[in-house]
């Protein structure tokens, strides 16, 4: 089940995916999904989603995609939220990462 959920998340990164929506998709409770991630992945569902979005963002940045387009393409509702998450995760800004 966890592998299927992880694949679902990967396929829907650009959209607004929530724990409840994901649980409904797999006909389980939100707490079941949450427990699976905590026990098997060592992170929360939302942390996993954010990490996957940021990994996808790094790829797009290195491909030369405009940063505001990157943020939208990986499911962030605005650039400032993307910027904060990226900087918190990697310790550098997306702009700085682009120059590396």
Predicted regions and their residues:
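Short helix-coil-helix linker/hinge
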Residues: 1-3
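Terminal helix-turn-helix DNA-binding modules in bacterial transcription factors
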Residues: 7, 11, 16-20, 39-77, ...
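Short coil turns linking two alpha-helices in DNA-binding domains
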Residues: 29-30, 77-78
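Short hydrophobic/aromatic patch on the recognition helix
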Residues: 33, 37, 81-82, 86
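…primarily DNA-binding HTH/wHTH and HhH modules…
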Residues: 84-100
